[in-house]
């Protein structure tokens, strides 16, 4: 609706126009929806202007860097938080393939390949994965980072630390979703 108004008239709608168009009783309801869109980085609100709405282009959102999404277990799986905690000003093109988001590692199960507790794991969002790749996997509602080994209807998610046994997933009884592949690590200053 906002884009259509800008295309038709050359300027964004007022809060009152948005409220009327969407059937809200007041402009305050429209303002709350605009704030939600701004939090999701779809629009930018220009303070103090009744028509102070700017639709962000996708490349402008990318310019803010990579989003940090929750935490990922590198040990026992934990429930992932699905909201963006913050953005880091890191060029996604530094990683091959290109990183789509960052996850904070929790645990030491991947330490033997240099993924440490507290690291930021750069992840390329894909479900096209192969055995031997380090993946971010969701088993039921838990998220973990492990090395993939698919054998028929069974998947082994291997740790890179001999103190941890593999996670065995029986695809006939459990749900497994691949969230992406690890494409890099950013070490935080916590280890110094």
UniProtKB/Swiss-Prot annotation:
Q: Which UniProt keywords apply?
A: Autocatalytic cleavage, DNA damage, DNA repair, DNA replication, DNA-binding, Hydrolase, Repressor, SOS response, Transcription, Transcription regulation
Catalytically driven reaction(s) = Hydrolysis of Ala-|-Gly bond in repressor LexA
Active site at: 109 (for autocatalytic cleavage activity), 146 (for autocatalytic cleavage activity)
Recorded hits in CDD domains, A to Z, give: S24_LexA-like
Locate the DNA-binding region by residue range: 15-35
Subunit architecture:
Homodimer.
The record ties this protein, via HAMAP family, to: LexA (MF_00015)
Please explain the role this protein plays, according to its UniProt record: Represses a number of genes involved in the response to DNA damage (SOS response), including recA and lexA. In the presence of single-stranded DNA, RecA interacts with LexA causing an autocatalytic cleavage which disrupts the DNA-binding part of LexA, leading to derepression of the SOS regulon and eventually DNA repair.
Which named protein is this?
LexA repressor
Organism annotation: Photobacterium profundum (strain SS9)
